[in-house]
Amino acid sequence: MLLLNLLVIALLGCAASKEARPLAGTEQIPPAETPVGIATTQGVQTAPTADTPISSTKPAASSTTRNAGNDSSAKDPPITVPSVKGRTKKDSLALVKAVRFGAENPNWPVKTATQLPGAILPGHRIIAFYGNPLSKRMGILGELPPDQMLARFDKEIAAWTRADPSTPVQPALHLIAVVAQGSPGRDGKYRMRMTDSLIEMVSSWAAKRNALLFLDVQVGKSTVQEEVPRLIPFLKRPNVHLAIDPEFSMKPRMDRRQGVVVTAKPGARIGTMSSDDVNYAIRLLSDLVKQNNLPPKVLVVHRFTHDMLTGASKIRLDPRVQVVIDMDGWGQPWLKYDSYRAYVEAEPVQFTGFKLFYHNDTKKGDPLLTPGEVLLLNPKPLYIQYQ
């Protein structure tokens, strides 16, 4: 088994000159023929602490937004922190800050064109199980046998229906269809494409629950432009949607110490995508909708650091494509709330998502956030993913 030095825990409570730097750790990576997947490196967060300004995450065109980091000496008015049963005061404070930050940002809700027929959002909330059947480590989708997985899925769907009866739940299975790898493979792209037969298998599971199917792309050293078109035969189906994961998009960068351009392999550092990458995916999906008379597609973009998505204000919305920025970092409740505030609320795009990790979120003894606790956020996430 290969070992990669991974970033796993954010340094908390320190002043951020650029970003708080996580501590180093190690995790085991499967051999090249086995998908590495998000479970091996996922959840590295550099969210500010509750008392740290978020200067690097100021939303575009929102100079009137309070506490976006323009003035690090500015003080919040006193807050009465509500008691959230079973949570610490730190958790509650982070929640209050996230709720207030979203409420005071004049760019929420995002103004968009008239909704097209068949659009899923905002009239529904998508609840998704994430992973890959080839690995138990990459998420709940592959952790349990299909029947057990779907039974657990049913329970989560019921819980969200009870928590918010006013917003119908739309079930979804979220398959990592292109999986980042720790080794280069034959073409040196550090990614593995899943077979059509595997995608069809998960599609058959989704059909049992009248669920959507999301195809998630971790490009490694490839590109969105190279990987997504291969999925077009599936994306032509009305119930199939797309997700792209900047964490595993390993673009060339200048190593200032060595004075050379380098491209890290997946897991060695957190990757990045630009608005150009997102806009390409939007255009491709929009063309498919138009050419095939399909209902609007949903595009999920994962994010848990500022630099994972650059130029968010330049993302060009299209009524044929509904864009979700999904906060997919793991950790204690306060860190997840802070990350949602800093990396999703601070740069409004269109709709928001929130990821829950059955294992990583509970490592330190914290119970998994409940639907009711997630729904306290403002804006309320309309895409919920379980890993």
Question: Where in the sequence are the language-model features?
Answer:
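Substrate-binding surface in catalytic domains of secreted glycosidases
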Residues: 246-294
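Bacterial N-terminal signal peptides
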Residues: 2-11
